[in-house]
């Protein structure tokens, strides 16, 4: 199961800050989340490309803003993971500065896919991201990642709790369960990306039947 647009994603460039980003036009959707929430794995599954975004067992390896081009108008963007403590303080501040510059200034940014581990409640920094994007009026779609590690009941409970929080405080955000390992939730996240990218999938033509 592949998506006709996102399977075409190819690495474009990495930028340490806003001034090194590609030209600001078209449609971009950025992927954000805590450094161990499964962001790179999700990107690889969504694009059906195992090695597109580099995964690592060491959280915090994504230190640059990484751009992947789907077509001439549309890009996916892998943002630096936030909230990881075991990095140099100056490095951490530089990441946060480039992250905030990109999210606040980038006019082609149409939405944010945000990773939250389904096995635990959102952290303080996750909630700060939701508060921040709310003030910017930036749409957010949350992937409750690693949902395959939960049984069906606890997974649904995690989804309902997050949905209730969003309904009460964050009307700009939506949420779904997602598993990179089991490839669960792909259709839902593809539909959200299509909406933000203003992309219509080609309709497969039906073979003509001969009249008798």
UniProtKB/Swiss-Prot annotation:
The keyword Metal-binding applies. Mg(2+) binds at residues 40, 62. GO terms for molecular function: GTP binding; metal ion binding. GO terms for biological process: division septum assembly. GO terms for cellular component: cytosol. Its cofactor is Mg(2+). HAMAP family: GTPase_EngB (MF_00321). Necessary for normal cell division and for the maintenance of normal septation. This is Probable GTP-binding protein EngB. It comes from Hydrogenovibrio crunogenus (strain DSM 25203 / XCL-2) (Thiomicrospira crunogena). The gene is engB.
